[in-house]
């Protein structure tokens, strides 16, 4: 499933074709994806201008001139294709090669920019939903999400407070979207390596006895921000499912220090350890026991 950098790269790729432009026509080519489309889905979108295209955690949010918001989630295999006079491009094609099977083109937006924006999703784990902007605080998919890891609200003090007293592993805590929004398996592994912290360490050790952030919390916040920033600049990680809107693959996977590198030499200078793999909560964790403590 795409993580924050992949979704952000998709957002950046869609902006030139969608933000500030009117949806001249919206079409849903089937009655459902992961969830059924609302009965008035196409009608509520057609004729509306996308006044802003944002992101919250792993969700894309299109603000509409009607006061509604279109929430979009890529799921496991969803991708957007932008077709215009310049050709055919796919923002954020990272994990799976883009499906060439047009029978999986499930949603089409014909924009006043002249572009056709097409959502293709072979597995149909993605979904789209419209809700009123005024009700955003009550939207179930967004309610309870933690702070954005690249936002000002995310700092060592906040992370220490969120993890104080937690006996769960540090890896599990970071994957909890209530603690911090948008992180997934890849970037948690990479951030823990950069911060030299074991994924098995208790989350509570990010706070001291008084609840103040320890040096570990400071290092981890810096590492999370850095790894996400680097991944966005690189266009995400091309492992299985998603390409950029340009159709190009992301390149951050070439910079992986530990993820999917089991048995290889650790890249920390002076460390003679090797990358190990363990399973935590049903997910593979990659780490170096030599320098991550």
Curated annotation (Swiss-Prot):
Q: Which cofactor does it need?
A: Zn(2+)
Entry keyword set: DNA damage, DNA repair, DNA-binding, Glycosidase, Hydrolase, Lyase, Metal-binding, Multifunctional enzyme, Zinc, Zinc-finger
Query: CDD domains, alphabetically?
Result: EcFpg-like_N (cd08966)
User: What InterPro entries does this protein map onto?
Assistant: DNA_glyclase/AP_lyase_DNA-bd, DNA_glyclase_Znf_dom_DNA_BS, Formamido-pyr_DNA_Glyclase, FPG_cat, MutM-like_N-ter, Ribosomal_uS13-like_H2TH, Znf_DNA_glyclase/AP_lyase
**Record's family?**
Belongs to the FPG family.
The entry describes its oligomerization and partners as: Monomer.
Q: What is this protein called?
A: Formamidopyrimidine-DNA glycosylase
Q: What is the organism of origin for this protein?
A: Rhodopseudomonas palustris (strain HaA2)
Write the lineage as a comma-separated list.
Bacteria, Pseudomonadati, Pseudomonadota, Alphaproteobacteria, Hyphomicrobiales
